[in-house]
Amino acid sequence: MNTIVPFSHPMYIMLKPAGSLCNLRCKYCYYLEKSKLYDDNKNHVITDALLEKFIKEYIEAQTTPQVLFTWHGGETLMRPISFYRRALELQRYYARGRQIDNSIQTNGILLNDEWCRFFKENNFLVGVSIDGPQEFHDEYRRNAMGKPSFHQVMKGIDLLNKHGVEWNALAVVNDFNADYPLDFYHFFKEIGCRYIQFTPIVERIVKRTDGLTLAPGMQEGGELTDFSVTAEQWGNFLCTIFDEWVHHDVGEYYIQLFDATLANWVGVAPGICTMAKECGHAGVMEYNGDVYSCDHFVYPEHKLGNLSQHTIYEMMNSDRQKDFSKMKYRLLPQQCKECKYQFACHGECPKNRFIRDCYGNPGLNYLCKGYHQFFHHVAPYMDFMKNELENQRPPANVMNQVFGK
């Protein structure tokens, strides 16, 4: 995914202007149930005063001349264009010479000509959630009436292309579509999507007193959901797509995980928190000003505070957030510490670390077997591309090489 990662200092907040409100009811969505944390307020909409406070403090907290705002949901387009026009107005007012960039994630259902013109005119990077061809997409991405959404999403993508809007795809890999990696990959190439983020879905059901049912990471127990991808599926999925990509598409199509893997191979920051040594640089703010450690850790125990009582800088640089950030490395089990590919994934996302390692220690990633398969498979190609980069040659030269298996 062509994500902008401009920060030398970890100060990044994903804003949810409409909370978990959404016009779809995707079976695997981890965020819909977060509305239970705010049952006392059905109007999940950020106020103008809070929006202004956030924009002002967020810009002031940055240490570089470029500032990235990320709008997320729920469904972001359930707020009107007037809301985002107001946000841009506030950004310009408080920018003080800094470059402001905006990215927004949407399911694509509400996209129309007006939205697309707005995104084009204001240089938004649009992320579209789409799970591949219709058969795969409609399996889990349906509305509240149970009706499929694929054709609506494709209409939205056609409009983005019509207006020349830069867009990327976020595709969830689940139990159903993981067995068809090439169908998946070819679909995105056919619709002209050059930046793709494949996200494995792994969720567990637990009983909690706060009404939430999905388990946070770094805790054992719970029943694995039927839509979760297996480690074996994930490994096979990645290896199959990589083989196609590395022989034909390097430099033409960009797959976030492949880029992050190469970055770790070279020894530079991977650009995504899941593959970094430490996480915690990417917080989340809900519509009411509540700030949490991470989008996948929106639970009361990971709440850092509220914008009405604390500044963004205070919360994101608090001891609680620093401890959260260091937890990823500090709690690596022995198997990870001994693994030759630890540098490549650093245990991946703590959310998925809930099984025991070969020594019986807690904290191994549920997808470990799949990632290990992938890293072993791509190692000779990564070594070659690393050498090309170090000698100031394009890594796409790898497509001209033949590697024995």
Predicted regions and their residues:
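Conserved AdoMet/S-adenosylmethionine-binding subsite of the radical SAM
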Residues: 55-56, 78-197, 204-206
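Conserved alpha-helical substructure of the radical SAM core
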Residues: 1-117, 121-122
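Radical SAM enzyme [4Fe-4S]-AdoMet core and its adjacent flexible, acidic
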Residues: 143-151, 158, 162-274, 278, ...
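Long, charge-rich, low-complexity alpha-helical segments
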Residues: 1-5, 186, 338
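Flexible mid-to-C-terminal extensions adjoining Fe-S/redox cofactors in radical SAM and related proteins
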Residues: 298-405
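Disulfide-bonded cysteines in secreted/extracellular proteins and peptides
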Residues: 22, 26-29, 273, 279, ...
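Short, ordered coil/turn segments that flank beta-strands lining enzyme active or ligand-binding pockets
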Residues: 287
